Amino acid sequence: MVNYPNGRSRAYSTVPKKKKSLTELSVTKKSTSKTKGMVAFGKRGMNFEAEINATNEYYLSRGLAVIHKKPTPIQIVKVDYPQRSRAKITEAYFRQASTTDYSGVYKGHYIDFEAKETQQKTVFPLKNFHEHQIVHMSNVLAQGGIAFVLLHFARLNETYLLPSSCLITFYYEKGGLKSIPLSHIRENGYKIETNHIPRIPYLEIVNKLCEVQ
């Protein structure tokens, strides 16, 4: 019998546990192997954001560019202090990001971009973009930076780089349309041919943007 400070007690059985037979051990082993296989299979695919992050890590490790994902702002609501030297956040909420997803430096150029994904096949919904992000990209362009968006059509498995200038023009001047036609993206953007390493080689297209700037 073990007595706990809260007054509760727990009795431990002295009856020896029955050993599993060879058959039971075999079944357990097969079941475990199957579960591990299911987990491994589930981790095989990477989402769009993870692929971009892996690409950025590749660029950084090769000394090609320094580009990082901006952390999502958090609104802290409640903090507990179990000890004077330790604080524990017990309640917090994600706040809406004020700018774009990624920023960094490439060949002396400031790089700033947003990454979005859609299940649509023929259009990219503009509701995926917030006006403050459009304003931010406009400000980046005004200061001589390079801004763009990476758009991924999941069901088509197609990824495009669209210069922010094209997005901004479409956002404000196309009569209140709620989406960008894929045909417009293909005409004004650049298709990214995905590789094994790096997965999304977008710097190949950024080179072109640097040349025309």
UniProtKB/Swiss-Prot annotation:
Detail which positions bind Mg(2+). Answer: 99, 101, 114, 133
**Listed GO biological process terms:** chromosome segregation; DNA recombination; DNA repair
What is the reaction catalyzed? Endonucleolytic cleavage at a junction such as a reciprocal single-stranded crossover between two homologous DNA duplexes (Holliday junction)
- Which Gene3D superfamilies does the record match to this protein? 3.40.1350.10
InterPro entries this protein is in?
Resolv_RecU (IPR004612), Restrct_endonuc-II-like (IPR011335), tRNA_endonuc-like_dom_sf (IPR011856)
Q: Which CDD domains match?
A: RecU-like (cd22354)
Q: What GO MF terms are annotated? A: endonuclease activity; magnesium ion binding; nucleic acid binding
Q: Under the cellular component aspect of Gene Ontology, which terms does the record hold?
A: cytoplasm
- Cite the EC number: 3.1.21.10
> Per UniProt, which keywords does this protein have?
Cytoplasm, DNA damage, DNA recombination, DNA repair, Endonuclease, Hydrolase, Magnesium, Metal-binding, Nuclease
The Swiss-Prot or TrEMBL record lists the needed cofactor(s) as: Mg(2+)
Q: Where in the cell is it found?
A: Cytoplasm
Entry keyword Hydrolase? yes
Q: Where is this site: Transition state stabilizer?
A: 116
Main EC class the enzyme belongs to: hydrolase
So which domain of life are we looking at?
Answer: Bacteria
HAMAP family recorded = RecU
Q: Which family does it belong to?
A: Belongs to the RecU family.
Q: What is the name of the protein in this document?
A: Holliday junction resolvase RecU
UniProt lineage = Bacteria, Bacillati, Bacillota, Bacilli, Lactobacillales
